[in-house]
Regions:
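Flexible, acidic/His-enriched mid-domain "rim/lid" segments that flank
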Residues: 89-197
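N-terminal accessory/capping or targeting/presequence segment of soluble
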Residues: 2-102, 112, 147, 154
Length: 200
């Protein structure tokens, strides 16, 4: 990321910004407690934690995420258009939120998308990166988090053991595995594990 300086602490008058999928970004999941396979916008602005979500996900985010506010991407998009932006994109939407807060300094993770970073810098924003652990609190696990991790491990072990039982029951015919009259594919095994976890 060009022209960005690494800092280990957040300047007081800066925003934190993620554009990522929480399904693959553990820092973003930690911040929101919301699982999504597609990238979304997350901001920390003057002590307030915000998510900007598409119309498809906005209601689910409002019900499940542990943030202060969930904003509608399409509403911000319409607002940008009303201000003369012909075809608003992700950065135009972020710009509105940061403009409202009067902030120009942004703290981002090292994985922040380069093209988005370049666009923000072109608009006059100063970006700083911070290495992991982005949230120091993540290093310390609470008793509740430890219990959740242990429960997840037990569920996975039980589900995998159940899948092994299915494999032992399977028959080989013409070099193909069959179970209960159907071909036992790797996708079917994964599905059996997933179902097993859901019932633990």
């Amino acid at each position: 990321m060009s022209h960005s300086t690494e800092h280990n602490s957040r300047p007081e008058q800066s925003a934190t910004l993620f554009i990522a999928a929480s399904e693959t970004d553990s820092n973003l999941y930690y911040a929101t407690r919301f699982i999504a396979p597609d990238p979304f916008i997350y901001l920390e602005v003057k002590g307030e934690r915000l998510m900007v979500m598409s119309d498809l996900e906005v209601d689910r985010a409002r019900n499940q995420a542990t943030v202060d506010r969930v904003l509608s991407y399409s509403e911000l998009e319409r607002r940008a258009k009303s201000q003369g932006v012909k075809d608003p994109g992700t950065i135009d939407v972020i710009h509105l939120v940061l403009q409202d807060a009067g902030l120009k300094d942004i703290l981002v993770p090292p994985t922040f998308p380069f093209l988005h970073a370049s666009r923000l810098q072109e608009m006059g924003y100063r970006l700083r990166t911070k290495r992991d652990p982005f949230y120091e609190q993540r290093v310390m696990k609470s008793d509740e988090e430890v219990r959740h991790i242990e429960a997840a491990q037990r569920a996975t072990e039980t589900a995998v053991a159940a899948a092994h039982q299915h494999l032992r029951r399977a028959e080989i015919r013409d070099n193909v595995l069959w179970l209960d009259g159907e071909i036992l594919t790797s996708e079917r095994v994964k599905k059996l594990i997933k179902i097993g976890r859901a019932h633990v």
